[in-house]
């Protein structure tokens, strides 16, 4: 929980040791305790460009992420600092500072590419930090963005005729913020003042031409435009004279360039107000444990030589959470039944009604806590567990009723049995007295409350066990003629047969009630599942509509700039996306 976060400083989340990426268990432990949604801001850039200073400012501290004061890169791997979000109550701000790209000591671009890819996969806002202006050198240094399709997969197995276009990435890529440090130019174009955002848009314009040089110029710009439809730019003056840069974290704001101080404040304000909660496909809000799962899945994929895959990460997360959702739903069912049920219930229907209410709530708990339940395997598992729980309650109900009725019979009929043993009814007229007493005791038994569903069966079993005793009293009663005895025997047989028929009818009725309940359970599962699928479908369409709008904007820009070929490629992507949306709108839930 946010109130329980006490990270006084950053901690290494993903270690980079000798070119190998390893997850730090202590950092995962911190993430696992964060139950609120997280806003994840990652910063990436060349080493010694002041990334850590900005991250410390976002954390509200002067110190924390190592700034270093030499040309050596200080941050290795990816470091994490979790702080309560200053503008969004109930949210946690997770700051990720990455090791500097292009560190000559590493001599391994592979490593840089993975750090870059992980920062994109884990964040909801991706900050790219560089020095000076956006020139071709700055673009060349951002070559990692052109490699993303070779570093990240959105789907575990793309369709045969479907390349992973930017639509797949746009749906889960973070917003892009470019921070330009020690920016010394005047912000203007064609003699007119422009904003930092307009400067970024201007810098991302493409060159007409088909030469290799033109392609090299255009490729990173195209990738940024396609992968990151939402872009923002901030420029920063040099904070102090070069000689004082080494003491930057020790200096007070009044010792810094006022322009720089204001620019940093504007940057922090934007991040706090505009950075979104980390969200997965389908509108799934990421909290600490979910971020922990993503970190593990991605790093394990890279370590094993695979490409980190968004779909696989979500499915791995779904396996963990859906399994927990089943247990949570079952626990809720048990809690509700424990509170509501008093065994034995008077009728089976009473128990089944309580089961139905508790089951409905349990399904609601599962539906709220689950996602990406492929083939509804976990919901089927829940249905099976709830059915078993219901059967257990039915068995307990039966046993409780049997115990209660047996105890009642003992209390009510044991005095009669004692009288029989004493020979009180072994006399002329004794049989009629015995039958009268028996009827009185049966009436008393029937009047006892909460005997449960076994009341009749236990009574009839008891009476059947005493038939020989009843017959002995009948045969020894000398006041009855043989004919009367025969009639009485037939009457007892008829009464017993009638009771047996009644019991069979009751068993049949119980079976019918159980079958009706099973059908109602199935319909309840189906109803809630259908509603969830409709919500999921609406959410996905919403995401696709957002992606479509961004693609249409980009296509319009390409047309205005005169890039017909790129515009046609974008049109193909738009048509593919529109086709998927039509299919999703018309698909039926079976």
Swiss-Prot record:
Protein name in the entry: Guanylate-binding protein 1
Catalytic activity reported: GTP + H2O = GDP + phosphate + H(+); GDP + H2O = GMP + phosphate + H(+)
PTM info: Isoprenylation is required for proper subcellular location.
Top-level taxon of origin: Eukaryota
Location of the GB1/RHD3-type G domain: 35-276
Region entry GTPase domain (Globular), spans: 1-309
Molecular functions per Gene Ontology: GDP phosphatase activity; GTP binding; GTPase activity; lipopolysaccharide binding
Keywords from the UniProt entry: Antibiotic, Antimicrobial, Antiviral defense, Cell membrane, Cytoplasm, Cytoplasmic vesicle, Golgi apparatus, GTP-binding, Hydrolase, Immunity, Innate immunity, Lipoprotein, Membrane, Methylation, Nucleotide-binding, Phosphoprotein, Prenylation, Secreted
Subunit structure: Homodimer; homodimerization occurs upon GTP-binding and is required for the second hydrolysis step from GDP to GMP. Undergoes conformational changes and oligomerization upon GTP-binding and hydrolysis. Heterodimer with other family members, including GBP2, GBP3, GBP4 and GBP5. Dimerization regulates subcellular location to membranous structures. Interacts with SQSTM1. Interacts (when phosphorylated) with 14-3-3 protein sigma (SFN); leading to GBP1 retention in the cytosol and inactivation.
Membrane topology: Lipid-anchor
UniProt EC number: 3.6.1.-, 3.6.5.-
Entry GO terms, CC: cytoplasmic vesicle membrane; cytosol; extracellular region; Golgi membrane; plasma membrane; symbiont cell surface
One Pfam family linked to the record: GBP
Residues bearing PTM Phosphothreonine: 588
Hydrolase among keywords: yes
Residues annotated with Phosphoserine modification: 156
Prosequence residues removed at maturation: 588-590
Subcellular location: Cytoplasmic vesicle membrane; Golgi apparatus membrane; Cell membrane; Cytoplasm, Cytosol
Modified residues (Cysteine methyl ester): 587
One Gene Ontology biological process: cytolysis in another organism
S-farnesyl cysteine-type lipidated residues: 587
Its biological purpose: Interferon (IFN)-inducible GTPase that plays important roles in innate immunity against a diverse range of bacterial, viral and protozoan pathogens. Hydrolyzes GTP to GMP in two consecutive cleavage reactions: GTP is first hydrolyzed to GDP and then to GMP in a processive manner. Following infection, recruited to the pathogen-containing vacuoles or vacuole-escaped bacteria and promotes both inflammasome assembly and autophagy. Acts as a positive regulator of inflammasome assembly by facilitating the detection of inflammasome ligands from pathogens.
Sequence similarity: Belongs to the TRAFAC class dynamin-like GTPase superfamily. GB1/RHD3 GTPase family. GB1 subfamily.
């Amino acid at each position: 929980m946010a109130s329980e976060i006490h990270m006084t400083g950053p901690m290494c989340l993903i270690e980079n040791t000798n070119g190998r990426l390893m997850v730090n268990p202590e950092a995962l432990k911190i993430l696992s305790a964060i139950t609120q949604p997280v806003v994840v801001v990652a910063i990436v850039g060349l080493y010694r460009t002041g990334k850590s200073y900005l991250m410390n400012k976002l954390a509200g501290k002067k110190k924390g992420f190592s700034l270093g004061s030499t040309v050596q890169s200080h941050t290795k791997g990816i470091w994490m600092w979790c702080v309560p979000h200053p503008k969004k109550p109930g949210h946690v701000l997770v700051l990720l500072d990455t090791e500097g790209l292009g560190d000559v000591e590493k001599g391994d671009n592979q490593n840089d590419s993975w750090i870059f890819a992980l920062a994109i996969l884990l964040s909801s806002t991706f900050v790219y930090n560089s020095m000076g202006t956006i020139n071709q050198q700055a673009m060349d240094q951002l070559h990692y963005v052109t490699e993303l399709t070779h570093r990240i997969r959105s789907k575990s197995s793309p369709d045969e005729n479907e390349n992973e276009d930017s639509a797949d990435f746009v749906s889960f890529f973070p917003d892009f913020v470019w921070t330009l440090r020690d920016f010394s130019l005047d912000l203007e174009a064609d003699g007119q003042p422009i904003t930092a955002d307009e400067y970024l848009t201007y810098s991302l314009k493409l060159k007409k031409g088909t030469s290799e040089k033109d392609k090299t110029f255009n490729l990173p710009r195209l990738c940024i435009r396609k992968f990151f439809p939402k872009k923002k730019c901030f420029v920063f003056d040099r904070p102090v004279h070069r000689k004082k840069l080494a003491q930057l974290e020790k200096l007070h704001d009044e010792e810094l360039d006022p322009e720089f101080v204001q620019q940093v404040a504007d940057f922090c304000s934007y991040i706090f107000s505009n950075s979104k909660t980390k969200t997965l496909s389908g509108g799934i809000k990421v909290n600490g444990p979910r971020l922990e799962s993503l970190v593990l899945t991605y790093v394990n994929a890279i370590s094993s030589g695979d490409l980190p895959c968004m779909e696989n990460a979500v499915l791995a997360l779904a396996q963990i959470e859906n399994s927990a959702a089943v247990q949570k739903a079952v626990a809720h069912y048990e809690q509700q039944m424990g509170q509501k049920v008093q065994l034995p219930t008077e009728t089976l229907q009473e128990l089944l009604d309580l089961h139905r209410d508790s089951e409905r709530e349990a399904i609601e708990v599962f539906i709220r806590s689950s996602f990406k339940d492929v083939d509804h395997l976990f919901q089927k598992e829940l249905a099976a567990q709830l059915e078993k729980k219901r059967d257990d309650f039915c068995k307990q109900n039966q046993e409780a009723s049997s115990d209660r009725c047996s105890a009642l019979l003992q209390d009510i009929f044991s005095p009669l049995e004692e009288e029989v043993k004493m020979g009180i009814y072994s006399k002329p007229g004794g049989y009629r007295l015995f039958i009268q007493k028996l009827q009185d005791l049966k009436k008393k038994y029937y009047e006892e409350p909460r005997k449960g569903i076994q009341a009749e069966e236990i009574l009839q079993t008891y009476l059947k066990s005493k038939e020989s005793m009843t017959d002995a009293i009948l045969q020894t009663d000398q006041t009855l003629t043989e004919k009367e005895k025969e009639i009485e025997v037939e009457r007892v047989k008829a009464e017993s047969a009638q009771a047996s028929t009644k019991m069979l009818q009751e068993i049949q009725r119980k079976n019918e009630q159980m079958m009706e309940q099973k059908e109602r359970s199935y319909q309840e599962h189906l109803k809630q599942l259908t509603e969830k699928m409709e919500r999921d479908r609406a959410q996905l369409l919403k995401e696709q509509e957002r992606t479509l709008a961004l693609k249409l904007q980009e296509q319009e820009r390409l047309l205005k700039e005169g890039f017909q070929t790129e515009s046609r490629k974008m049109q193909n992507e738009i048509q593919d996306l529109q086709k998927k949306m039509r299919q999703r709108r018309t698909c039926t839930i079976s």
